[in-house]
Amino acid sequence: MSKVQRLEKAQSALEKKSQLTKREKQHAEQSLASLNSQKELLNDARKSCDSRPGEKLSSLSCWGRNQFVELLADVSVLLEEKIKAESGNLEQINQRLEEERRMTSGVEHLKNKETEKQQQKQLRDELQETDRLLQRTPR
């Protein structure tokens, strides 16, 4: 296998790896959007509780308002932790994607350089062959 073929194979592998990383990034972005949406709903529920103090919730009539507000606060903290973790994960994925782009670019540069080197060698060989044939022919 020639050096160019090995570089093409490496480039193809890096491109496939980047595709997988892009899918992973898309999943992380969707997960983060979902968590943010849940947090928004939670904040809206908290505001609703704050706007009607003293009432009991029909679905949670056994709970006092303060207990429910405390539960919402606890869930909010947990959601915030998940959002922070998912944001960190997304940042790592973006860093990996950037590294993969640099590696792919580097491999492509090496492949182009090797291809050019092979073309120059082929041209030199053809010129030498032409010179050799010209020297053989009588004038």
Which residue ranges define each predicted feature?
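Charge-rich amphipathic alpha-helical interaction elements
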Residues: 1-139
